[in-house]
Amino acid sequence: MASLIYRQLLTNSYSVDLHDEIEQIGSEKTQNVTVNPGPFAQTRYAPVNWGHGETNDSTTVEPILDGPYQPTTFTPPTDYWILINSNTNGVVYESTNNSDFWTVVVAVEPHVNPVDRQYTVFGENKQFNVRNDSDKWKFLEMFRSSSQNEFYNRRTLTSDTKLVGMLKYGGRIWTFHGETPRATTDSSNTANLNDISIIIHSESYIIPRSQESKCNEYINNGLPPIQNTRNVVPLSLSSRSIQYKRAQVNEDITISKTSLWKEMQCNRDIIIRCTFGNSIVKLGGLGYKWSEISYKAANYQYNYLRDGEQVTAHTTCSVNGVNNFSYNGGSLPTDFSVSRYEVIKENPYVYVDYWDDSKAFRNMVYVRSLAANLNSVKCTGGSYNFSLPVGAWPVMNGGAVSLHFAGVTLSTQFTDFVSLNSLQFKFSLTVDEPPFSILKTLTGNLYGLPAANPNNRNEYYEISGRFSLISLVPTNDDYQTPIMNSVTVRQDLERQLTDLREEFNSLSQEIAMSQLIDLALLPLDMFSMFSGIKSTIDLTKSMATSVMKKFRKSKLATSISEMTNSLSDAASSASRSVSIKSNISTISNWTNVSNDVSNVTNSLNDISTQTSTISKDLRLKEMITQTEGMSFDDISAAVLKTKIDMSTQIGKNTLPDIVTEASEKFIPKRSYRILKDDEVMEINTEGKVFAYKIDTLNEVPFDVNKFAELVTNSPVISAIIDFKTLKNLNDNYGITRIEALNLIKSNPNVLRNFINQNNPIIRNRIEQLILQCKL
């Protein structure tokens, strides 16, 4: 059966690479820090939308929604929407250039009969006739082209979000009109756009015109939830002013500061020393053939002085996107050949992960505006002698590339015990003189750097430069940033898992039911389960190891060892003096299950609660006493296998979490039954119990004493077709005793026959089980 995969994951021994353990320590180890926020802290949460990433020197990153700002008067810049959040009736804003453009927007609450109201606009008392027979607010845009003219209503916005917008762009003033959620923009001409100023009477926001689609979304649907909390305090518009400072080579600058957090700009010069690692593998035989010459990641630790401070640094150099070359001197055993040797040319990248023990790397968690400037370095290859048993030795000689800085991001370096947040510098390559060749062969005048001797007797290659970043750190320097190590790695994985969960849940509609039953009957092992993923056999083995490592911490794995005791205790704790009738056994609140099952009274509540607890343990009992019938875990594993094969996003990093979650979350509503002679006792995870005869499917009293005796000795059967479905099937179609018995035993062949006959009741039941396979 397909549930064999779960049994293998529970029972098989496995090995774990040291790198896997180190990666787990880095991503899961947490440190709890208690911080008392001061009186000026607006929220108790860490900031959102912070993350690692490269920002070029010439790039300015703007927020989508900047604000809120207090009511003010200013001359708005062009290409920026001013979004105003009106909270009362009256004047929302006034705008003019004192030449050919005067406009004022007034808010009118819902259900207002025609009435004349007095408004103070541009220092004058004006009377406007307003009305609003809508359930929404109305914003009347009153306009005049001269100070001598009277205002008239140019356009109206009917809105339930109480937001209005104004934009200076292209020689025109743009606003919104119509009715939400389908309000659109319209414009007014003016000959003097630059001098238009605005008087804002409510809180306002600033949105770049490049994000006009978001502005349209806010106008029609309202602000995001974080902007609707009273903890967000409006600031003065002057806070947008930037104080420019010329940064020194090595210094920390406080950009902003509150009682809890502060932004520190960190500027450092840096010396990067790195070395290439390689691996040379010789084939067996007579000694004339080599298997591979390849690049490997190499670590290097060193010390240097930075402004009089002794710095201990650690680098890891790796290569991505190598070119594979080969040389074959002939087919004889004594002909020299190299099956594969790697060469880096223009297309690969070299990555150097850098970490040092200075203060700059102590709180490198929330980082923005990360940039660096590094010089280039030329790497020239040396010679490598292929020592043949007889004859002249071929020599791979020469080759050169230059490394040019191409970007920087946050990364994680792994030591023997912990993971460290570090900087990853990316270098692009250009080929350089001299070319490389293999002397004594016809291979010559090739450009690039082969992996045979990339360091050329150099202890290291050195790159100098500087980097700058803005880091969010606790205001108190004695605090460590309260977040897990390697947070960026885990956040990336969580984003991948979120996307994968959505894809998995959407695939439920595409599963063919008849094929699912056939797949559920197959003995799925780890290789067949993961073989649908596009990968090599070695990667499949690695994925299976990762899945087992994750699965051992699942709720299913931790519960299986305690199954016997917990099942026995839970069963014996139920009262043995009361029988329960099915139709009165449903209790609405099953969440308050007692942790101490020994303190049980004879009340109906306690019996039903214990029954619900027992039903959750029956899955574990079923797994170790498998019958010939189909189980919920067979369907769960079959659906999981189908979705893995159909998925386009599954990978080595996400597979362990998905398999573990599937074992715990697929088909949460289950029913299990015990069969004794001609009577069936059925119980589900919601605490409902049924007892009925096989011949008539009529209910009989549920005997707790009998159930407690049978549960430890009789096999447990998954109620794929539960009692209600059986009853419905018999009432509408009529079934024989043999058919009923086979359905009670979850016979897969009988289930397949009903599905092939397109029986709507059975098909609907199976469809509901498939739809329960969600993460």
Swiss-Prot record:
Sequence motif: KID motif, positions: 643-645
Motif (DGE motif): 307-309
Cross-referenced Pfam families: Rota_VP4_MID (PF17477), VP4_haemagglut (PF00426), VP4_helical (PF17478)
Entry's Gene Ontology BP terms: permeabilization of host organelle membrane involved in viral entry into host cell; virion attachment to host cell
Gene3D superfamilies: 1.20.5.170, 2.60.120.200
InterPro entries named in the record: ConA-like_dom_sf, Rota_A_VP4, Rota_VP4_MID, Rota_VP4_MID_sf, VP4_concanavalin-like, VP4_helical
Region annotated Hydrophobic, chain positions: 388-408
Residue ranges the record marks as coiled coil: 483-510
Positions marked as site (Cleavage): 230-231, 240-241, 246-247
Protein name per the record: Outer capsid protein VP4
Originating species: Rotavirus A (strain RVA/Human/Japan/YO/1977/G3P1A[8]) (RV-A)
